From Swiss-Prot:
Entry protein name: Mas-related G-protein coupled receptor member X1
Keywords: Cell membrane, G-protein coupled receptor, Glycoprotein, Membrane, Receptor, Transducer, Transmembrane, Transmembrane helix
A molecular function GO annotation: G protein-coupled receptor activity
Topological domain ranges for the Cytoplasmic compartment: 52-59, 122-143, 202-226, 280-323
One Pfam family, short name: 7tm_1
Family, as annotated: Belongs to the G-protein coupled receptor 1 family. Mas subfamily.
Amino acid sequence: MDPTISSLSTESTTLNKTGHPSCRPILTLSFLVPIITLLGLAGNTIVLWLLGFRMRRKAISVYVLNLSLADSFFLCCHFIDSLMRIMNFYGIYAHKLSKEILGNAAIIPYISGLSILSAISTERCLSVLWPIWYHCHRPRNMSAIICVLIWVLSFLMGILDWFFSGFLGETHHHLWKNVDFIVTAFLIFLFMLLFGSSLALLVRILCGSRRKPLSRLYVTISLTVMVYLICGLPLGLYLFLLYWFGIHLHYPFCHIYQVTVLLSCVNSSANPIIYFLVGSFRHRKKHRSLKMVLKRALEETPEEDEYTDSHVQKPTEISERRC
């Protein structure tokens, strides 16, 4: 599962081995990607600095911290990848091994980002559907433990995919296909988990017998999931089609890969913008620090009770007493 290598090696005026016209990467997209990635890295760096050093750690902040770390990792990979595309376009040599390592490294933050987003959505769904059970049985450091497991699993899948595709791809092709199948199946499972938990949460909040007032945290999560479905999911779908249907990266599919990468970079860059927009919406104070804005974006306080906290504290206290 390494479309980066193949798409970097295409030519514009020749025919490939299958007789299809090859194509060079679109130079406009190759220049857009580094611009978007630099902006996204700036935003995610601010989020990492605030959550890592300036704010008190909570369950949701641990998830958001790791999500920003995954987004930064993903943006770094594709920033370097875009520079290699530009170098390749102008005939500057780039070592094949660096392309192989970079192509497989990019799958690690993609898996971890989707996993963390699925974990956030699932936890919020459980807290809304079964609030008392959730507050009573949730381990104190569960978010940190889940994030560690996600990173370990993501690195394991990425390393195995790189090892079998780079070193044993020709001699042990069946093992490479098995690893790709596991990665693809895991991505499908994560997407179904994200979609199912988000849909259940949406139905419960908007259509339940007891409607829960919207909190800023729910708006933040909903917008993040929506942006992922629009911008982040196409890359996963492309990898799915690449594995199951054997789509080759000659004309015109090499352009599809570039577009999906650009959209995924937009997705990773948009998350900090979502946090700061939600946190600054209807803020009464004129002078707002980034720390306060980010803190408000992750608050579970409903909009109408934001300044009183009367309707939020009571259910939480009751559930904790029942534990």
